[in-house]
Structure formats: structure tokens, C-alpha cells
Amino acid sequence: MAEAGARRPFFRRRKTCPFTGPNAPKIDYKDSKLLMRYVSERGKIVPSRITAVSAKKQRELARAIKRSRFLGLLPYVIR
């Protein structure tokens, strides 16, 4: 039997990957507006545990951000 004052533990709902599904956006190094959502205010790539991006798509995203930086579409550091 459960105690009268015992609470149920809080379970955070697992977020779904924003790049999976039928009408999900395609990760492209030329789409700097989309890529900027996954870069912090200091210019670092935001980890997947915060953005809920799957491991496969996180690797794709990191590759696209790095390509975009190399071509000068995204800054390396934001001041």
C-alpha cells in the first residue's frame, strides 16, 4: 500500500526528433535560418539532449553547421 503523503515520481515526456516525420525539414548546409536554431548564442552547437534531435540527425546537423561555417554562411563565434 502507498502512503497517504507519497507522491508519484515526475517523468519528463520524451521529446520527439524534429527531423523525423513526413513533413520534417531537410538538413541542408545552405539553410542558415534552420541551422541557427541549433547553435547557441555563443556560436556552439547545442547538444541533442537539449534539442531532442536523434543521434543520426545530430551528426548530420553538426556536419551541415560545420560546412556552413567553412563557407562563411554561419559565424564560428558570436560576440
Curated annotation (Swiss-Prot):
Keyword Ribonucleoprotein attributed: yes
SUPFAM superfamilies per UniProt: Ribosomal protein S18
Recorded GO MF terms: small ribosomal subunit rRNA binding; structural constituent of ribosome
Pfam families: Ribosomal_S18
Swiss-Prot/TrEMBL keywords: Ribonucleoprotein, Ribosomal protein, RNA-binding, rRNA-binding
Domain of life: Bacteria
One GO process term, biological-process aspect: translation
Any GO CC annotation of this UniProt entry: cytosolic small ribosomal subunit
Matches recorded under Gene3D superfamilies: Ribosomal protein S18
Subunit structure and binding partners: Part of the 30S ribosomal subunit. Forms a tight heterodimer with protein bS6.
Recorded family membership: Belongs to the bacterial ribosomal protein bS18 family.
Biological function: Binds as a heterodimer with protein bS6 to the central domain of the 16S rRNA, where it helps stabilize the platform of the 30S subunit.
Record-linked HAMAP family: Ribosomal_bS18
Protein name in UniProt: Small ribosomal subunit protein bS18
Organism name: Rhodopseudomonas palustris (strain BisB18)
Gene name for this UniProt entry: rpsR
